[in-house]
Amino acid sequence: MDLAIMIEGQNGLNWQRWQRLARAVEDLGFAGLYRSDHYTNAEPPDLDSLELWVSLTWLASHTQRLEFGPLVSPVSFRQPTMTARMAAAVDDLSGGRLTLGLGAGWQEREHTNYGWDLLDIARRFQRFEEGLTIIAHLLRSDTPFDFDGEYYKVREAVLLPRPARPGGPPILIGGSGPKRTLPLAARWADEWNAVFIPPARFRELNARLNELLEVQGRAPGSVRRSLMHGIVFGRDEAEVRRKLGNRSRASLEARGILIGTAHEIVEQLGRYAEAGVQRLMLQWLDLDDLDRLEALAHGVLRQLQ
């Protein structure tokens, strides 16, 4: 299992922070850097939120090794043909390091504030599958494509120039829902990303995904398994307690949140690796705390190597 960093772009991300974080994450040896795609927070206050694709374009041309991408980008924000075009271009610019994370959308406030239709859950996922169909075809096939859906329609659509990477950037589908998300992942995804679940639940969903992949005629190894999760890390026990504040350690641990010093974090990561997690994206909420990020890298990454 390898480790990557995930940040919430709507929590004050600006150019200075993004550039500083990207350089630090690469220099410290993490496998990747991922970010959310939100206009604003689910609840006030509204903070800086650097635009997704502009920020990823900078990352593609100013890093050498990091894998990166949205975790995840709602199809409700952009027409799927534009998403496919931008993803292919940014992936080419990076030399093939983008993972295209996609989701149905969930945050009502930003959709209302900025004029996007969130839709009810059933229609939201219908739109998501239509978007996936178009994006996947444009990235993976050079045959002109017609599609006549309820939400999207295209005629003789083809993506040019063709992606340098055969099939374009891998598609990641994020979410832990067994009824809607997992079947979509089994059909369309190159990577499935679960969100905030403990090891036992990941193991259950991982097994269910294998069953769904078999129905689709796909090998289990064709889909990478990853998890985005929270972390409360301290260089010593006193710092762990300070970072926890008034939150209940027991309730967080019940959700599988990683809590502790470097040695404790490594032990907890081992349980996720045993459950089938191949990459874990650590949600790093303090965009300015690079000293603690460095301590995490030095204390944890070296023990995983």
Q: Can you annotate each of these PLM segments?
A:
Residues 1-305:
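Active-site-adjacent structural elements that line small-molecule/cofactor binding pockets in enzymes
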